[in-house]
Amino acid sequence: MGHFTEEDKATITSLWGKVNVEDAGGETLGRLLVVYPWTQRFFDSFGNLSSASAIMGNPKVKAHGKKVLTSLGDATKHLDDLKGTFAQLSELHCDKLHVDPENFKLLGNVLVTVLAIHFGKEFTPEVQASWQKMVTAVASALSSRYH
């Protein structure tokens, strides 16, 4: 698990306060499903995922993306205990949903891309480094049940 400096924590929480969770969540999950189409198999119940425009406009994708980012927002308040914060979600994704833990890394990388798009010049290399550390640590926490 990554160790977060006080600067990392400040950088993460400062940017997070400006994130529109609904928009960024839908875009992040939508992009994951478009860019990595094999991840769609976990979302059979979401209806039409036949094209990029269908995925990006799908209300179930948007709603679940918001749920995912809301959970990530909670994590920004518990950076020193991500494993504990995500224990139940790790169990759900491992035992019940059988999600490949590699997908958590992919989702984190897509989120970093979405943040870069949304925040432009404000998303400096230093901000990116803190967020990359965050999404890597979250992916590790979500994967903890698999080991």
UniProtKB/Swiss-Prot annotation:
Tissue: Red blood cells.
Positions where N6-acetyllysine occurs in the chain: 60, 83
Conditions for induction: By 5-azacytidine.
GO cellular component labels: cytosol; haptoglobin-hemoglobin complex; hemoglobin complex
Effect in UniProt of substituting residue 81 to Y: In Victoria jubilee
Residues holding heme b: 64, 93
PTM sites of type S-nitrosocysteine: 94
Keywords: Acetylation, Heme, Iron, Metal-binding, Oxygen transport, Phosphoprotein, S-nitrosylation, Transport
Post-translational modification (record): Acetylation of Gly-2 converts Hb F to the minor Hb F1.
Effect the entry attributes to changing residue 122 to K: In Siena/Hull
Domain Globin: 3-147
InterPro entries linked to this entry: Globin (IPR000971), Globin-like_sf (IPR009050), Globin/Proto (IPR012292), Hemoglobin_b (IPR002337), Hemoglobin_oxygen_transport (IPR050056)
PROSITE patterns registered for this protein in UniProt: GLOBIN
GO molecular function, a single term: oxygen binding
Phosphothreonine PTM sites in chain numbering: 13
Described purpose of this protein according to its UniProt entry: Gamma chains make up the fetal hemoglobin F, in combination with alpha chains.
Assembly and interaction partners: Heterotetramer of two alpha chains and two gamma chains in fetal hemoglobin (Hb F). In the case of deletions affecting one or more of the alpha chains, the excess gamma chains form homotetramers that exhibit neither Bohr effect nor heme-heme cooperativity (hemoglobin Bart's).
Family recorded in the similarity comment: Belongs to the globin family.
The protein's name: Hemoglobin subunit gamma-1
Organism of derivation: Homo sapiens (Human)
